[in-house]
Amino acid sequence: PERNTIELLPTSIAGRKVRFIVLDDATDTTAAVRNARKLVTEDRVDVIIGPTVTPTSLALLEVIGPAETPMISLAGSSVIAHPVEGHKRWAFKLAPNEPLMAARIFEHATNNNVKTIAYIAFANAFGESFTSEMRKVGELRKVQTVAHEKFNPTDTSVTPQVLKVLSLNPDAVLI
């Protein structure tokens, strides 16, 4: 989806021509770092838009920081850009931070009498930080966590996790 978005972006900004270079890292941190190095050293880009997942965004910090090249990550985890120090001074993200997302989710859940919740989340940095924040807010809102199942982003099926969660009959399931 992100690649398709590039076609919608303007070809000029303030009268200056803009050139977009699209490289696919396939959510692989090694490929992401290799692509970022190419963009910074060979293409001499002004900014990197992406990556789209937390692990690859975190990996790029070691490239963008020393190069002083801003990165606008499309991933969700707050750890990409916070605290604003070191290489993270060059990292920005568009998605809201986990506390804001959790607050809104639980506001809706408690308004709809949700008392129990289960999570099925990525087994990566974003999945961990997101479910950690969800548990904190859930406890404050008196919503009991009945399951926290994980899966790898490359998994082709989450059937075992779904079946386990559904067997516990939670009021809500967050994936």
What are these regions (language model features)?
Residues P1-K38:
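N-terminal extracellular/periplasmic Venus flytrap/periplasmic-binding protein-like
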Residues N4, R44-E149:
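Extracytoplasmic ligand/sensor domains, especially the bilobed periplasmic-binding protein
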Residues L8, R34, K38, A59-E62, ...:
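Alpha-helical scaffolding segments of alpha/beta enzyme cores, especially the outer helices
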Residues R19, K115-T116, D171-A172:
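Residues that mark the start of a beta-strand
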Residues V22, T29-D46, E107-N111, T156-N169:
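Short, well-structured alpha-helical segments in soluble
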Residues A26, L94-N97, K150-P153, I175:
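Short, flexible loop segments at the rims of nucleotide/cofactor-binding pockets, characterized by
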Residues D28, P55-T56, F151-V158:
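Short acidic loop-to-helix transition motifs that present clustered carboxylates
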Residues I49, A172-I175:
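Structural motif
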